[in-house]
UniProtKB/Swiss-Prot annotation:
Source taxon at top rank: Eukaryota
Region entry Disordered, spans: 823-865
Comp. bias regions, Basic and acidic residues: 853-865
Species this protein is from: Caenorhabditis elegans
Family under the similarity heading: Belongs to the FHIP family.
The protein, known as: FHIP family protein C05D11.8
Matching InterPro entries: FHIP, FHIP_C
Disulfide bond sites: none
Length: 896
């Protein structure tokens, strides 16, 4: 059934340029149309039992559409916002109100048709309004019927969903209604004054009606989300609208509930090897919906009012992360766990707004399972196994590291290192030596398998240069990300409680003077100030202040300083430090007057004592007094310094004043009164401003406490951590079994190492790269040397090993091409198209797409062939890894 009526269908024969520019003809035609509509309305009004037939309905709708077309012609032709004859007719006759009253009385079979037509009429009024200064929606005869239509549509929509629950597709009326609301929101952006007409303290119909359609399929849901985003961006500074959204609507709950619903529709199994993530065609739209929902949440957090954002973050944490994501990681199905890791990684890579990222970090660091295991420890535990889930867990951990969040890195890496590593300050200082970079990088280059040295694709100066170029860019970016961290994690600045000292002479010569200058003010105060990690317990009760070098001085000068003396210093710092005065001897009165300089100047101005009008004015003479407490002259003083304590009557006061010789005229009493009043008003205004500022700070503090009350914190002390880093231990174990691992696992593992090694913290750099004296503990360098020896020995025993190397190059190239093709649609690469590095710039999550044909190893592959294939791939990867680590070590000499 075609309901696209047009005004030209009636008057096409008379349409001309003269007709289009003649308002008189418009009025005549409008009266003709209105007479038809009026008769139909009166017929039902005079006879309530009259049953409207289909032809009668079509006649009314066609004429109403033509009338609205003429109305828009009149409104757009006027240069000023005036009420023309046609618009006046709409007002006086209340045309839209009467049509709505008539429509409600129709039978159910005709009511839906009429409702759709009325929606299109209002859509015409909104979309065809091209006048910049006259929007018809500001008039109540137009606006009130629109509100009634929204309420009527809501009731009818509920009826349709109940009576036709089997039809899950969006109806045509729903699509047109959402389109109408979207166009209204667009008008609100163009003219923000319209917000006053649509929002009241107890209702915001346009916003409320959009909520049920936020997650509708297709264009309808997208239009609804765009409209909501427009409203929240326009009202971002309006606190009343923010309170309405959070307190009187279910928007925040629906937002996170819809995200959870999108997650529940995702497939429980991800195809591919873990590095290549693929889905079946039937789940392609569901994955796209999940991605759109994440983008929408992030966009809302970027544009909405802070109160709305805080509410969304709360529901995002409780309704989605802890109730949906966390249980998915605690299942017994490793396939589903691996898929859930991919979806969480997709969430991490899509959401960039800090308030939502903070919620994700909170879940990672604080949530536990029934056994008390932390969430990130659960993820690390899934690395073992070497299957597809292990690959996805490595990729997810890599996403954790990419956040460059100090809290995440403290929990995963630095907290165990601070309490369990055995390096002393003297040993750790090796990372600052200039010769370290060249010597250590050569050591890592020596770990390249001998069998790979003849292949320029895997070991060459050009490839090393490419790694050095990429490493410089990545480490500079990482250093910038870590610039705002609270600690440097260098094992020196934090004090002697972090690193055991071999002797009292352990040098701290690598700490810059500026840091040593600030160590007194920052470190000495820590016993009295709480710390966000250890709740004030990061310094033990036996903390030795002697280890702190004050202002760059040697430790011996401060060896006798005790905590009691430190308390005295702290008490002294609380006092006001008097400014230096260029006088040999200054009385107590002068000292007090110097502290209150401004008050003295004001008094001198009143008494005329600063009335000198020339630069050569003689200084005020200071005469001795009988009870003077000092006989010293003060050449730079311009006031009597003694005798004021003895002033007990007006005579003595005048006698002291008479001793002053003043050049210049004294002020009149009226001028003095004006000056005093001016000073009083200034002080009073300052107090009022101070009270306003204190009141505002109190409100902000109250809000801050409310927000903090929503956040579950789990602070910990660095002392209570007996275990070594599970992440670092897992990484070293993975490198040690390089020849037994499959290609996807090794590539994800080395990509994780690449991101971890780019952190510029000296403590981590020493642990990862430098050789250790303790041979009982495994270290990366010794492990690489062992793997190199093993690969070279195995290569000598494999027949035609060079053929397997060539096949390995082909396998890596084909895999890189597949991953690139999958990721080109969402993030096409530009400068890295010909990047020969293997572990930099890879896409971790391909966009939704069809399942391509995968080339998998033949099931008839013999055990010897499998060993040869893995050994060849391990040799290629190890050659790349050694060159990457060597380039990182060289760059560390410039960064650390």
């Amino acid at each position: 059934m075609d309901l696209n009526f047009s005004a030209t269908s009636v008057s096409r024969a008379r349409w001309s340029s003269a007709y289009a520019s003649d308002p008189t003809v418009w009025e005549q035609l409008f009266e003709t149309k209105w007479s038809v509509v009026s008769n139909i309305l009166e017929r039902k009004l005079s006879d309530p039992e009259h049953k409207v037939v289909y032809d009668e309905l079509m006649s009314l709708l066609e004429n109403m559409t033509n009338m609205c077309t003429l109305l828009m012609l009149e409104a757009n032709s006027q240069p000023e916002p005036i009420i023309g004859p046609i618009l006046d007719k709409f007002f006086t006759e209340q045309i839209l109100e009467r049509v709505l009253d008539w429509s409600i009385q129709l039978t159910d079979s005709l009511k839906s048709i009429c409702q759709l037509a009325i929606i299109r009429i209002f859509e015409m009024i909104v979309s065809d309004s091209h006048s910049q200064n006259h929007c018809l929606l500001v008039h109540k005869p137009i606006l009130n019927p629109l509100f009634r239509l929204c309420e009527w549509f809501q009731r009818a929509d509920i009826y349709w969903r109940v009576s036709k629950s089997e039809n899950k597709k969006t109806s045509e009326a729903e699509k047109m209604f959402v389109l109408l609301l979207n166009q209204i929101c667009t008008k609100l952006v163009e003219d923000r004054t319209l917000l006053h007409f649509f929002f009241h303290s107890n209702q915001f119909v346009v916003f409320t009606e959009l909520i049920p359609f936020l997650y509708s399929a297709g264009d309808t849901g997208q239009l609804a989300r765009d409209a909501v985003l427009l409203i929240l961006s326009v009202s971002a500074e309006d606190k009343s609208i923010a309170e309405y959204v959070t307190e009187r609507t279910s928007f925040c709950q629906v937002l996170t509930t819809g995200l959870s619903a999108c997650f529940s529709q995702l497939p429980r199994i991800i195809l591919g090897d873990g590095g290549e993530r693929l889905v079946e065609d039937e789940y392609r739209d569901f994955l796209a919906d999940y991605h759109s929902a994440l983008l929408f949440c992030n966009a809302i957090a970027q544009t909405a009012h802070s109160e709305v954002v805080g509410n969304i973050a709360s529901f995002f944490y409780t309704g989605f992360l802890t109730n949906v994501i966390k249980p998915a990681f605690l299942q017994n199905d490793r396939e589903y766990i691996g898929a859930s890791m991919v979806y969480l990684q997709m969430c991490l890579e899509t959401i960039v707004e800090p308030v939502l990222v903070r919620s994700i970090v909170q879940m990672i660091l604080t949530e536990r399972d029934d056994n008390g295991t932390l969430f990130y420890e659960i993820v690390i535990s899934y690395v073992k196994g070497g299957d597809k889930t292990s690959v996805t867990s490595l990729s997810l951990i890599d996403s954790f590291l990419k956040l460059a969040c100090e809290d995440v890195m403290l929990a995963l890496v630095f907290r165990p290192l601070l309490t369990n590593h055995s390096a002393t300050k003297k040993q750790l200082s090796v990372v600052y030596k200039a010769s370290r970079g060249g010597e250590l990088s050569q050591t890592y280059l020596n770990c390249i398998p001998i069998c790979m040295l003849e292949y320029r694709e895997a070991a060459s100066h050009a490839l090393l240069s490419s790694y050095m170029y990429s490493t410089r860019i990545r480490m500079d970016a990482r250093s910038e990300q870590c610039r705002s961290w609270k600690w440097k994690y260098d094992g020196v600045v934090a004090g002697s409680f972090v690193l055991p000292a071999e002797s009292d002479d352990d040098a701290t010569f690598n700490v810059s003077f500026s840091r040593m200058s600030s160590s007194r003010s920052s470190t000495s105060m820590t016993p009295y100030v709480s710390n966000r990690y250890s709740n004030g317990s990061h310094l033990s009760h036996v903390f030795n202040i002697n280890k702190v070098c004050p202002l760059g001085q040697p430790q011996e000068q401060n060896a006798d300083l005790s905590l009691s003396e430190l308390d005295d210093d702290l008490e002294e710092d609380k006092d006001f430090i008097l400014p230096s005065i260029d006088m040999e001897d200054v009385s107590e009165e002068m000292t007090a007057s110097k502290v209150m300089t401004q008050s003295t100047i004001d008094y001198m101005h009143i008494s005329g004592l600063d009335g000198s009008e020339s630069d050569d004015a003689l200084p005020i003479r200071i005469e001795d007094s009988e009870r003077s407490e000092t006989d010293s002259e003060a050449p730079k003083s311009n006031f009597v310094l003694s005798g004021w304590r003895d002033v007990k009557d007006m005579g003595t006061f005048k006698q002291l004043l008479s001793k002053q010789e003043v050049k210049g005229e004294k002020l009149d009493s009226s001028e003095i009164v004006d000056f005093i009043n001016q000073k009083y008003d200034s002080l009073k205004l300052g107090e009022e401003k101070k009270e306003d500022i204190e009141e505002e700070e109190s409100e902000n503090e109250t809000k801050g406490k409310e927000i903090k009350s929503r956040i579950v914190t789990d602070g910990f002390s660095i002392y209570n951590f007996p275990e070594r880093s599970k992440l670092l231990q897992t990484i070293l174990e993975g490198v040690e079994t390089l020849c037994e691992n499959e290609l996807p696992f090794n590539t994800e593992l080395f990509s994780l190492i690449a991101d971890l090694a780019t952190y510029p913290q000296p403590l981590l750099a020493y642990y990862l790269f430098d050789p250790k004296e303790d041979s009982s503990e495994k270290h990366l360098l010794t492990i690489l040397q062992g793997v190199q020896t093993r690969i070279d020995v195995m290569a000598e025993g494999i027949e035609s090993f060079e053929i397997w190397i060539e096949r390995g190059f082909e396998t890596l190239k084909a895999r890189a091409c597949r991953i690139k093709q999958q990721s080109t649609a969402s993030s096409p690469r530009t400068s890295d198209d010909h990047d020969p590095t293997l572990f930099y710039g890879r896409s971790t999550m391909a966009p939704p797409g069809r399942k391509p044909l995968l080339r998998e190893p033949s099931r008839q592959e013999t055990l010897d062939d499998q060993t040869a294939r893995r050994t060849a791939l391990a040799a290629i990867l190890l050659a790349h890894l050694c060159q990457m680590l060597a380039s990182i070590v060289l760059q560390q000499s410039l960064i650390i």
